[in-house]
Amino acid sequence: MLHHDYNYANDTGDIEPMKITILDDYYDTIRHLPCFEKVAAHDVTIWNDHSQDVDVLAERFKDTEALVLIRERTHIRKALLERLPNLKLISQRSVYPHIDVDDCTRMGIMLCSSQHAGTPSYATVELTWGLILSAMRLIPQQMKSLQAGKWQMAVGKSVRGRTLGIYGYGRIGTAVAELGNAFGMNVQAWGGEGSLDRARADGIDVPASRETFFATSDVISLHVRLYPSTRGIITADDLGGMKPTATLVNTSRAPLIEDGKLVKALNAGRPGFAAVDVYESEPVTDTAYPLLNMPNVICTPHIGYVTEDEYNVQFTDIFDQIVAFNAGNPINVINPDVVKGE
């Protein structure tokens, strides 16, 4: 089934139910979360498939008053917004490069997006380490070999004693670094001045230069939010300066790396390996996608935050924003000019 409708109109008259549409809930997870009760008094439609077709989306959202997005899965651009006369609110979490904020403001549509400044995504931290260990110990390759009727196919590498480079020492980067220390790795960090200051304060090594960071790390894990200023922040020169035995891990956003440069760098042998959870365009359904067919790459389908526990944390924020908006006290407003009526 592509979608489900839930009409829980409140008989008490305490609130005015809103027409809420939730997108891209691939596994029909959200209605089973404890936090779903927060919107139980509203008229909720959940779509389990994905579409980026403007005509399809306009038809689906024609009566929608509050639109719920799961991260950046669906782009909300001017051509779509102009066809949604009933839309009052977009509620989501984290950054919003997939939304035309200025057009939302011009059309009187409020964007509320919690930036979750305090708690890191521990689910993403866990996946990052799953990818690091899988890459170092060649776990997917060993399993594929075993399924083919063969025994051990190669010798892996231990992480203990090797150097872990954290690019972006924020909430997630800090948690990844803590586990690196627990594994007995030598942890170093690079990034903006804020990252470097936090790293130094925590006793994390900061190399003398960016070049040294890339040249000396055995594993580099990226933990930077995607903004216009960080797009392409990892350059071909950075990648080319890595060891041929090194592994690059990206559970952040693919456009942090210069477009097309990762595949070229891997083909050139520096770095020697990569483990990625994010892609330039998602979802990736083309089996000919270059990274999927490289023997020195491990790929997962952007599942860093995809756990029941993380979903409940995220959708608690998202639903709280809807409840607050409906009560006339919006929170986490990205475009406050809508509130001002400008």
Regions found by a protein language model. Give the residues of each.
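Oxidoreductase and adenylate-handling cofactor-binding alpha/beta cores
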Residues: 125-144, 178-185, 315-329
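Rossmann-like adenosine-cofactor binding region
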Residues: 59-62, 75-79, 193-289
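Glycine-rich NAD(P)-binding loop of Rossmann-like domains
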Residues: 142-175, 184, 203-204
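Phosphate-coordination loops involved in phosphoryl transfer and adenosine-cofactor binding
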Residues: 17, 87, 160-163, 236, ...
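Phosphate/diphosphate ligand-binding glycine-rich loop within oxidoreductases
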Residues: 64-143, 157
